[in-house]
Amino acid sequence: MKYIAILFLVLVVIGCENDKKSNQKVIGQQAENQTDPQKQLEEEFGEYNEEVKPDDLEYYKAYNTALKLWKTPFHELNVKTSFGKAHIIVSGPKNGEPLVLLHGMNASSTMWYPNIKALSQNHRVYAIDNLLEPGKSQIEGEVKDMMEMMSWYNEIFDQLKLEKFTLIGASKGGWLAIYIALQQKARIKNIVLLSPAQTFMWINPGSEMLANLTYTLAPKRKRLHGVMETMSVDVDKIENSYIEQYSIATQKATFSKFILQMTPYSDNELNSLTMPVLLLIGDNDIINNEKSIEKAKELLPHSETGMIKNAGHFLSIDQSEVVNKRILQFLSLNQESSPH
């Protein structure tokens, strides 16, 4: 079974030049030396690094349109790292307890639109676009292994001065949240897992998974609605502007070798996580089921679990109000009096 799951995962994700001076005749006269346009921008605006490739224009437009769904103030932060630019959407009061959001595969940080207003009311929220997926983070060079990916996140946490914070991860972001917590146990205050993929159990191949696989191999826009019906109990509830952004993202996505490393965590690894952990899954979830809840209860020392009614894998959208309430209740119960 695990080899089938691995096979599924393999398939599912298929400088400025120096100043130049030229002598040109303009209407019979010598033209003045011209400054390189990029150099001018750098001198006028300081660090000018917001480069957008022509192929990304359509996606960026869709991303920005989806951001209009965020019914709360935000600003976009670009953090320079050794591996490229980290794009982070920041919301909430500056003195609020920090929350770091890790989105699902190819979903980008815009997926949090039904949750961000509630989560950022009293918390400082940092939604990070994954470096290896469609989004506004931009990779430079190569990320060789998961430890380098961890280094990328550590650079972000350090620059944001996040000493103690809560991780909230959805789907693939949930798996990643556990990975980060295993490397940074002292830094992670709480973990919230929203139907984490391949974290407690192997994904069971089936007809619904086959539909997702078929779409991934040939991501046609007309097929997307049917695929999303396997992930959501009410696709019509999902905002069209987000679906458009997600559609373009799935067409842009390339295979990541790190998918092969997304295997369920061992009993010892899960048992070593002593911070409070909240696990929520949908009752119509094709990624997780009651076995995930049972394993979380058995192995995580301080866990809280919940099965959300009338929700699929996209439970943060299907039942956003219920999910938001459960998350905030969990955070309130596990609030520390000490400053972060």
Predicted segments, located by residue:
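Alpha/beta-hydrolase fold catalytic core
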Residues: 16-97, 163, 332-340
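Active-site loop/oxyanion-hole signature of alpha/beta-hydrolase fold enzymes
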Residues: 127-168
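Flexible "cap/lid" loop of the alpha/beta hydrolase fold
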Residues: 175-182, 190-218
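Conserved alpha/beta-hydrolase catalytic His-Asp/Glu region
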Residues: 202-207, 216-272
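Short beta-strand/loop motif that positions the catalytic acidic residue
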Residues: 273, 279-281
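Acidic catalytic loop of the alpha/beta-hydrolase fold
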Residues: 284-288
